[in-house]
Amino acid sequence: QKFNPPAMKEKIGEKTKIVVICNPNNPTGTYVPIGELEAFADTLPEDVLLVMDEAYMEFATEPDCCSMVDYMKAHPENPILVLRTFSKYYAMAGLRVGYALGSEELIGIMRKCSASWNLNVCAQKAAE
């Protein structure tokens, strides 16, 4: 199915706290052009966190399939979290090495919730 911003927006209610978009999508490889993503992000309520799962971004070859990192930096007032991984592109699936990009506030919240032992030494060395 194609990304449908109006239909997605219609599903966002008072109880909605997070919207997650995988771009590019796994396993189909389809993607949402950056312009559509930015326009959609502009319409989200201030209290809804947009989580962009960009695990496969390094495989994208289309010029309009771009990361939301620049948008996130340009709009610090919008709660956006971009998730990336080394596991897919660098063939490190067994090591489960990834990272999150977001505001200091969002990253601080994540740190409070994460276990301090969630990454083994082998994975840490591979990420270096």
Residue ranges of predicted features:
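Generic recognition of cysteine residues
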Residues: 22, 65-66, 113, 122
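PLP-dependent aminotransferase class I/II
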Residues: 79-128
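Walker B beta-strand of ABC/ABC-like P-loop ATPase nucleotide-binding domains
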Residues: 20, 51
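A structural signal for well-ordered alpha-helical scaffolds and beta->alpha junctions
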Residues: 1, 5, 65, 103, ...
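Active-site pre-lysine segment of PLP-dependent enzymes
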Residues: 2-14, 27-50, 56-89
